[in-house]
Design a protein with these regions (language model features):
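Basic, nucleic-acid-interacting segments
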Residues: 1-314, 325-327, 331, 353-357, ...
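Amphipathic alpha-helical segments in well-ordered regions
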Residues: 66, 243, 364, 368-372, ...
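Core structural elements
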Residues: 201-213, 287, 324-349, 358-376, ...
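Extended, non-catalytic structural segments that build the interaction scaffolds
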Residues: 304-311, 318, 349-354, 390-402
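Structural motif
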Residues: 328, 352-361, 401-402, 459-462
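M16/insulysin-pitrilysin zinc metalloprotease superfamily fold
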Residues: 354, 361, 369-384, 392-397, ...
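Strongly charged, low-complexity linkers/loops
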Residues: 381-395, 404-475
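Short, amphipathic C-terminal "tail helix"
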Residues: 463-497
Length: 497
């Protein structure tokens, strides 16, 4: 509860992460997105009589990796259970999941948010209940064809491995829910657990929302509502905001508290911008869980866990700290690099390792490299210039062999001619070193032509000399702006002018 609302919003998220495996959880069917409907199916994922599932060990490895990164306790013994319910896109009539012995227990994820009282930025730890493996359902598609309702089922997705990560109800606003989902997606993508493509359904979320009111010294809670069909950060934020307002109005009208009205499952209508009633929410007993007789339990040894632990060491949180503390990046600069993915951060680190200064490397990464990637819809892996070559160019600028403007021209040459060396790129620009005496003569000419700059500098405006760089470049495009300012300053301070 804060000063803006008479209630406290309580939110828990269930994030469904589609694991990045080549085949499904219990069969060899491909998980590739975009295939023709119902072409990536077999007797196992269709649930045909006599078919038997075989566990995909890669899914276990990725689930353990995620659990370690989320600070969970990894279960040495876990098993499979059947979750029984009927839905058109669930061909077997049950979902193979994990009920009482999930592969990952507890854990937490830290997010950036604001203190509700002071408004200051803080780091908040959100506790997790569990993370368990299960198979995905198929996909129902509803269209209007020739004026009639047309519903079709695509079972290509049925059997794809999912990791469902359940948080405690510790999120307090729509903004926090969005921040949590953003950080979760980033972490899962960084570790190669999912591709994180929300448009393709690789990461989806359900939100459990209710409100807490203070009445006569007691907390009164509204019935919990689960919101389905949240497939974007904006959808999560909008749905939680809408549902909070809806529950507030409903509570004002009815006064019904938790336990006095059934839990609901509501779907999010992104076009209408509202939640819509789907059904009363089921309890675990309604699913009639029982152990799957076709699958043996999973027993994890320390050797299997060790493999996943080694792959979970480089997290976004660890990289944020390294970029800020080791390379002196500003927090917003570090965040921008991290949001681009692990490959971009590694490219930056390689630049510094090859000898580029962190400050200049940051500037060129944020401006030139990322601009190229965005304009060409490219990944850092396809960027035409290696980190070693770009570092060599940046070091040439540091050594005053060329200035930043000419350096960007050289960069353009190297992009246009992949494989062109830094030396050849600089040579192709016709850059020649300007003799010191020639440069001093040029600076004397500049000061003679611009006496107002001398007056401004003597009056304490140290940046006045920057205005001489443009005229200097017109006289000789190869001059170094830094040297121009240094020589002009020396000439003024020595009394020459």
């Amino acid at each position: 509860m804060n000063s803006k609302t008479p209630y406290k919003t309580v939110i828990g998220l269930e994030v469904h992460v589609q694991l990045q495996t080549e085949t499904k959880l219990f069969c060899r069917c491909s998980t590739q997105f975009g295939a023709a409907p119902n072409t990536q199916v077999c007797p196992v994922c269709l649930g045909l009589p006599g078919s038997l599932p075989v566990l995909n060990s890669k899914a276990i490895e990725l689930a353990v990796r995620a659990g370690i990164a989320l600070n969970c306790v990894i279960a040495p013994f876990t098993k499979w259970d059947r979750k029984n319910y009927f839905y058109p896109d669930l061909p077997k009539g049950y979902q193979t999941s994990q009920f009482d012995l999930p592969i990952c227990g507890g854990g937490f994820l830290e997010i950036d948010t604001q203190d509700p009282l002071s408004g200051q930025p803080i780091r908040k730890r959100i506790a997790l209940v569990r993370a368990h493996l299960e198979e995905d359902a198929g996909k129902s598609m509803h269209d209007e064809v020739a004026g009639r309702a047309d519903s079709r089922i695509d079972l290509n997705r049925a059997g794809t491995p999912l990791l469902e990560i359940v948080s405690e109800p510790e999120l307090s606003s729509a903004e926090e829910a969005k921040s949590y989902l953003t950080e979760m997606r980033l972490l899962m993508m960084f570790l190669g657990i999912t591709d994180g493509n929300m448009q393709e359904g690789s990461l989806r979320a359900d939100a459990n929302v209710n409100l807490h009111f203070e009445r006569d010294g007691k907390t009164v809670a509204t019935p919990i509502v689960e919101i389905k069909n949240l497939n974007s950060f904006r959808a999560v934020e909008r749905a939680v905001l809408y549902e909070s307002n809806r529950q507030f109005v409903l509570f004002q009208e009815t006064g019904l508290a938790i336990g006095q009205s059934p839990k609901q499952t509501r779907g999010w209508n992104d076009v209408a911008g509202e939640t819509e009633m789907q059904r009363e929410k089921e309890d675990s007993a309604d699913y009639r869980y029982f152990p799957c007789p076709d699958l043996v339990p999973v027993v994890l040894g320390e050797s299997e866990i060790k493999i996943s632990r080694a792959a979970a060491t480089t997290t976004p949180a660890a990289l944020r700290k390294s970029l800020v503390e080791t390379h002196a990046l500003k927090p917003n600069e570090a965040e921008t690099l991290i949001q681009q993915g692990r490959g971009v951060v590694e490219y930056f680190e390689n630049l510094v390792q090859e000898g580029a200064s962190p400050k200049r490397a940051t500037s060129w990464m944020l401006q030139d490299v990322l601009r190229y990637l965005n304009e060409n819809n490219a990944s850092i892996e396809t960027y035409p210039i290696s980190a070693a070559s770009l570092a060599k160019l940046l070091m040439a600028i540091e050594a005053s062999k060329l200035d930043t403007t000419r350096g960007k021209e050289a960069l353009g040459k190297m992009i246009g001619q992949p494989g062109l060396s830094v030396e050849k790129a600089i040579e192709s620009l016709g850059i020649a070193q300007v003799d010191t005496s020639e440069l001093e003569s040029l600076c004397m000419q500049l000061l003679t032509e611009n006496p107002d700059v001398i007056d401004k500098f003597r009056a304490g405006n140290n940046k006045a000399l920057i205005s001489l760089v443009g005229p200097a470049k017109k006289k000789n495009k190869n001059v170094d702006p830094r040297q121009v300012q240094e020589i002009c300053q020396r000439l003024i301070e020595s009394g020459t002018f």
